[in-house]
Amino acid sequence: MAKIKKKGTSGQAKNYITRTQAVRKLQISLPDFRRLCIFKGIYPREPRNKKKASKSATQSTTFYYTKDIQYLLHEPLLRKFREQKALAKKIARSLGRGEVSDAARLEKNHAPKLTLDHVIKERYPTFIDALRDLDDALSLLFLFANLPSTSHVPPKTIALCQRVTHEFQHYLITTNSLRKSFLSIKGIYYQATIQGQDIMWLVPYRFVQRVNGDVDYRIMATFVEFYTTLLGFVNYRLYSSIGLRYPPKFDTRLDENGAELAAFTLEGRTVGDAPKAIEPAKSSSDAANQEVSAEVQKKVDNVIKKAGLDQASSEQPTETAEEVTDAIDKFETTAPEADTLPQPDMSGDQAGSLFAPFTFYISREAPKTPLEFILRAFGCKRIGWDTVLGGGAFTHNEADPRITHQIVDRPSLPESSLPSIPAAATDGGAVQKVKPGTRVPGRTYVQPQWVWDCINEGKLLRPDLYAPGATLPPHLSPWVNPKKGGYDPRASLAEQEEDGEADIDAEEESDEEMEEAGEEKPAPTAANESEDSEDESVDGGMDVAETDDDDSESEEEEEEEDEFAGIDDEDAGSESEDEEETARTQHQKELEAEAAGLPFSSSGAGDDAAAKKKSQAKKRAAKKRQEEEELERQKMMMSRKKRKLLEKMMYSNKKTAEESAKLRSKRRKIEKGAAGK
């Protein structure tokens, strides 16, 4: 006879363990258990049936895998947590005795230090695994780098986050790995490609942050501690891969001056500058080959001149050799109904040369930190800004003739309302000032959005569209492509509108205006009110029975209405014939006027235009009805399953088309209002 199984020895009761049981088994406190789970990447699990997993379970009971807790029993960090607990008891005992100096000595000399190196190696066996998990790490570290220091967020933590994030930004600048960026309500999104992995993170805007008490900063501080260690490992590996020393030199004086990225100095492992380790070194054999080829070319040219072969060679068509470049191929669609393939991003060489030939100056009101990072990541080496924004600039002189582009984010104001230059700045000061609102000749002025749109498009856009005070084009997400049949803000209305959509929209607007005008009726006059009251007083509030004469009159009126209804049907049937006759007569008059050499003018030009629009609307309706009938015939030949699938597709396409039509109508009204001004 088989042995009867006991309850709770198999199934969900064995696979899951509650948090209280796990804490008791590990013999640590609940905060230490949370830290340990965050470090090791162990998260709560939800069993299918909580009652089967534990008899006393409620809706708020937290479960973990039993194997995960068994795995934590052998974690070296447990010993550190126990040492911290024992040290806390000793410090509390010393404070209870009044031995403050002994308590301070114990905290300073005997506090155990946690190292997460082995945890990083366990969780990320390969470097690619670490890069894939870098999105959340960068977002949280950039968030803490912009937070104000409080009792929950110490300045030491903020400085550490700023240092590791700036080191990561320097790697992106050196290798031109940044690809896209987007300005959103939440902050600025960035996307970089490192060793084939796309990494995206969010950086908040530099506003005054108000730290609320609703957030548990102890949990976030644990994540920050883990992510700073992870990013330190990643930065070391990235810097080593391109031949740079890690960590880079850090100038405290420049950092206190607000230099930020300029406070770091990159050094190669060998003697020389950092960029030399990045640029492909030209070997001596290549230089020798170039010299030899130049000498050979000179000799060949002399021989050709002596032999008189220049004319003969010019007469023969020569094949132009195609230059071999590292440009990425683009796949263009061959038909409008074909699928659009996702285009590859630009390479690092193209990204590194986008802003290379320019010298930028960032005005005081523009966001310096993101602009400096993006411009440097896309090849710009010369960036200046005002002294108020900090040190480390290429120039602080706004009137420097080397500046080619200036980024301005202020409205265009009349010169009368602009302030004058201070007297101290005009008396031969070190930095020459430019009067606010004035423009330096030969310099291109753009708004900050121009920089973001250029890097997302991978090319330089027209700067006149982004001039100060101009209405900016829509700033769209580079990761969202317009769907087929959807609304595309970048395309014109003429490219997206359907046949007669603008006319239908105009007719609807005119009908709405007429309805609004009809609702505004004049108030009834006193004479009309008196007549109505007299009519009511005749009846005297009594119901009067109808006579036979009244019945006969009502029957005659009904017969007359029936006769008129028949006449209306006949008129409706002959409307098309009248329209054809009118069009034929109109055409005959035009021919006669043309033969006589006189301009044709008709009093009913407006009526003709209205009739023409009406006929076009009828043609469109007939065409649409014909297409619907054809579609119904095709659906009849389908199976039930395919017909249901087609109906679902048509429903979703109809919703998309309706939403696109609403957006186009809204845009049409905006453009019409702007044109009216």
Curated annotation (Swiss-Prot):
Main location: nucleus
Protein's GO biological process: maturation of 5.8S rRNA from tricistronic rRNA transcript (SSU-rRNA, 5.8S rRNA, LSU-rRNA); maturation of LSU-rRNA from tricistronic rRNA transcript (SSU-rRNA, 5.8S rRNA, LSU-rRNA)
InterPro entries: BRCT_dom (IPR001357), BRCT_dom_sf (IPR036420), PES (IPR010613)
Pfam families xrefs: Pescadillo_N
Protein origin, superkingdom: Eukaryota
Region of interest (Disordered), ranges: 472-677
Statement: the UniProt record of this protein carries the keyword Ribonucleoprotein: no
Sections of the chain in a coiled coil: 609-650
Protein name as it appears in the record: Pescadillo homolog
Native species: Emericella nidulans (strain FGSC A4 / ATCC 38163 / CBS 112.46 / NRRL 194 / M139) (Aspergillus nidulans)
